[in-house]
Every structure is written in structure tokens, then in C-alpha cells.
Amino acid sequence: MSHELTLQELAEFSANFNADPKNQVIARAAARSGVLEASYNERVAGRLTRVFSTELPTDNVTNQKQSGRCWLFSTLNVLRHDFGAKHKAKNFTLSQSYNFFWDKLERANLFYEKVIETADKPLDDREVRSYFDFAGHDGGQWHMAISLVKKYGVVPSYVMPESFNTSATNGLASALADKERKDALALRRLAQAGDQEGLEKARKTFLNEIYRMVAIAVGEPPKTFDLEYRDDDKNYHLEKNLTPVSFFNKYFDVDLDDYVVLTNAPDHEYGKLYHLGAEDNVEGGSPILFLNVPMEYLEQTAVAQLKDGEAVWFGNDVLRQMDRKTGYLDTDLYKLEDLFDVDLSLSKADRLATGAGEVSHAMTLVGVDEDKGDIRQWKVENSWGDKSGEKGFFVMSHNWFKEYVYEVVVHKKYLTKDQQELLSSTPVELAPWDSLA
């Protein structure tokens, strides 16, 4: 049944609002400083500290600037922690630009493939539309990053440093999106006509043009480089003529295939393996897999990995209850319910199911604070530069972890036997518009 707002109803709403004098005081405060500042809970600062019972050695933070590459930054942060610990090299950083280059090319290739596969469906089909919407996109997942590392290796940041177009990706992303969508229409026509020869020729031409665009904007990646650094004991190290792949294989003590994305998505069935094929970025690369488990397993495995001296990649909804200046993450940080006198509560499952919750960011766990086995707070390495938080490091309450963390990446050795067996099960395929996308 439809309902039209009447003048009588609106007058009643206004009378109700003005009947309480406190509303005018609150409205003036909110109008002057904004609803977040007006509802800021100062008591949170008294609960969150910068001291942790388990804490990894940390380096200077990185800065993704105006780009959506947090997933790549967090992955490379985990890897540089491994390099720093193994080779006693503080503040050694890896090039995000290098893997960003290959990501753009690989994504275009897979986008063209999906366009060809779905050429028999109309453009307004939900699956087809989701692929077109994702063209030129920066966002990503853990498995997307490791697919790039496994295929192309890594290089130190001085070999391929950040540039304008990697730090502010909108211009390139927009151009790539326009190019890929235009190409997609041509590929659909060729596929619908059954012109296989023309299809392969066009795809190769289009990928050659994508390569040129990214090379102009970012620069071509190096084929070889010289590794040069001084360790914490002031010893000088030099190895010449390394390839990015040989550098990774020789200098990093990690098998990326041994790591698992544990997710807590209570709108999905627990004890299941899920595959988000729509966001795979490398043909033949690591599929995007999630093992969905109750929250306590994310907590337990993350703590165990930190205690063993290894950082933890984690996916979260950072825009919720976050103060960028202080670096505080706490569920009671902004008391919006008190400000508006309404109930804003949603369960984690309901937030995911309605689009109110999402994995909007990836960061790195580098510490945890426990009191007699109870987790109080976590130390977080962000990728927003050193002007936010304490020199770029955030403090996250455990309540925030439970509400707004959806994924942690841990070694499979920390899983239960049953969970390890699930890794070889047939995954449930997720739609491109799923809440985990």
C-alpha cells in the first residue's frame, strides 16, 4: 500500500522535534562540527593504548595515497616484514608500482575473456553488467596479489618507485575503463558472429594497446635489477642481475600457497569454501577462495601467527567507527545513536546482506594486547602514510575486530584438521554481486 506524506504529518513531525528543547542544542552542535565530531566519545581514548603484549618489529609505513591498492600494499607489507626479519633489513620496502603494472594488464586480459564467455547474454544481464562495472578498477583481494607475486615476482621500491599515476590512479583507471568497455563491445560482436580468427586478432591488438597505455602512465617494469641494501648491522649487500622472480624465490622464506583466507561472513553458511571467480585477476593464477568460519577462529589464528613473529593481512570495513587522525578503531567511537536518539544497530549478517557492511580496506596486523588470554586490542599497520594515527599505525579494539573485520590471511598450519580438509573440497561459486565481492 502506497503512502504519501501529508502536510498534517509533517507538521506533527516538526512539533514532536521542537517539543524537546535538547534537540535544538544537539542540532546546533551537529550543524557546527558535523555529526561525527558532535557524537565523538572521548572515553575511547582512555581505553585504547599504544602498548601491546605481542608486537612485531615495524618499519616506516607506506602510503597508497589516492588509489585503491590497499590489498596490494598490505600483501607487500607482509612480505617486507618477512624480508626484514630474515635479512635484518629495517625499512626495506617493495615496489607497489611494479605489481600494479602487471595487475592492470592481467585484469584487462581476464575482462576480455569474461566478455567473450558471456557474449550470448544481453548487456543488461546482471553478470555482464557486473563485469563492465569492474573495468579499470583498483580494488582487490589477497589472492589477486599473490597471483601477481607468484607469476611476476617482486622488486625493491627503488627499482620501480611510485609515480604520479600510481599514487593518483583515477586518470589511468578512467581511461582503461573506457578503453576496455569499448573493446568489449567489439569482442561481443565478433563472438556473436562466430568469428574466432577475428576474435583472437582483436584481443591481441587490444592487449597490446592496454600495455602501451599502462607503460606510458606507469613505466615499463624492469626485467633485471641489482639488489643493494645495508642491513641493521651496517653490513653492505649487493647482488647483481636478479630477475623479479629469482629475487622473490631466493630472498623470501614463504610459500604463498600455504596461506588461507579465513572469512567471517555470518550471512553465509559456516564450514564452507567459497570461490569468487568474478574477481580473479590472473588467468591460471590463484583462485579467490574464502573459508567461512565463526569469528573465534579468525581471532585465534591471527594471534597464533603474530606470536610466531609473522604479520597478518586482514580485510575490514575501515570507514566504520574510525578516527583517521588518532588512528582509533572502536565500536563506541561515535555515539550516533545517542546523538539522533534512534536505534542504528544491525547484526554483522544483516549488514552484509543489506549492503551496509563490506570489505572496504585491507591492512596488516602487527601486534595484539592480551590480558590473561582475553584480547583487548590490536596494533594495525595501515597504508595511509605517517600523518594518520601514530606515525601511520592504528589501534583497534577487539570489539571493532569482531564487528568490522571480515577476513584474515593465515598459514594453514593454524587451522583445525577439519578446516584443513575443507580446503580440498569443491567450493561454492559466488555471484559477482555477492556480499563478499
UniProtKB/Swiss-Prot annotation:
Record-level GO cellular component terms: cytoplasm
Gene3D superfamilies hit by this protein: Cysteine proteinases (3.90.70.10)
Main location: cytoplasm
Single GO MF descriptor: cysteine-type aminopeptidase activity
Pfam families, sorted: Peptidase_C1_2
Catalytic residues of the enzyme: C70, H361, N382
Locations listed in the record: Cytoplasm
Record-listed E.C. numbers: 3.4.22.-
Family: Belongs to the peptidase C1 family.
Name of the protein described by the UniProt record: Aminopeptidase G
